[in-house]
C-alpha cells in the first residue's frame, strides 16, 4: 500500500505537477480513462506518462476528438476523470482581445456578455453523462472583473455542478507570480488576481 502523502490547499508549482498529485490523491482507484475536455496545446500533460484522451474544438491542436465539450462522442458512464479549463476572460473571441487567449482556447468562446458562466451548464450536463458514478471532475477556474463588476466564476461553477449531480469536494488555490489582468487596465478598483482555483468535483452526493 502506498504511503499517505498530504496535499496542500495552496499550490505554487505548475499545473502539470499539480494534476499528477491530484490524480493520485482523489480517485478511489487508479483512473483508467482520463479525458481532457479543453486540451489545447496539452500543457497540462507535459512530461506525463499518462494516457490521455484529448478533446478540443479547434482542429489546429490535433486532439483525439475535435468537438464541443458540451457534446462529446463518448458513451454514457465512459470516463473515470474529466479535466475542464474554461476561458478566464470574458468576450475572449472579440477583435480586440489578446492573441494569447485565442491561441490558448481556440474557438471555445462564441458568446457575448459580462461573464463566462453560460458555458458551465451545457458542459456540466455533458460531463455528468460521460463520467462514471463516483467519477472525478477537476476544473481550473479564475474569478475576474468585467465592466467594473467582480465575477465570482468559481462559485457559479460550483452551483452549476450541483444541478447535474456533482459535489464540490475540495478546492486548491494555485498562486501566481503575475496577475491575470488585461494590459489595457493600468488602474483598477479591485485587487489584482494572483491566484486561480482547482475545484475538485465528484459525481456523487458525497465526497468520502
What spans do the regions from the language model cover?
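Class I S-adenosyl-L-methionine-dependent methyltransferase catalytic core
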Residues: 1-208
Amino acid at each position: 500500500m502506498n504511503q499517505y502523502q498530504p496535499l496542500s490547499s495552496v499550490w505554487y508549482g505548475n499545473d502539470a505537477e499539480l494534476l499528477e498529485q491530484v490524480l493520485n490523491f482523489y480517485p478511489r482507484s487508479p483512473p483508467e480513462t482520463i479525458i481532457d475536455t479543453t486540451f489545447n496545446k496539452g500543457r497540462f500533460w507535459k512530461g506525463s506518462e499518462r494516457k490521455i484522451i484529448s478533446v478540443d474544438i479547434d482542429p489546429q491542436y490535433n486532439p483525439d476528438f475535435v468537438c464541443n465539450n458540451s457534446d462529446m462522442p463518448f458513451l454514457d458512464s465512459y470516463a473515470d476523470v474529466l479535466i475542464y479549463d474554461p476561458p478566464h476572460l470574458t468576450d475572449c473571441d472579440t477583435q480586440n482581445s489578446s492573441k494569447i487567449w485565442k491561441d490558448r482556447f481556440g474557438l471555445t468562446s462564441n458568446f457575448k456578455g459580462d461573464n463566462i458562466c453560460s458555458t458551465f451548464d451545457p458542459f456540466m450536463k455533458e460531463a455528468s453523462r460521460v463520467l462514471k458514478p463516483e467519477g472525478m471532475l477537476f476544473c481550473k477556474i479564475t474569478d475576474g472583473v468585467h465592466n467594473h463588476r467582480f465575477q465570482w466564476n468559481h462559485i457559479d461553477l460550483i452551483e452549476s455542478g450541483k444541478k447535474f449531480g456533482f459535489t464540490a469536494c475540495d478546492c486548491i488555490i494555485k498562486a501566481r507570480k503575475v496577475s491575470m489582468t488585461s494590459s489595457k487596465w493600468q488602474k483598477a478598483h479591485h485587487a489584482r488576481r494572483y491566484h486561480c482555483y482547482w475545484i475538485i468535483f465528484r459525481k456523487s452526493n458525497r465526497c468520502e
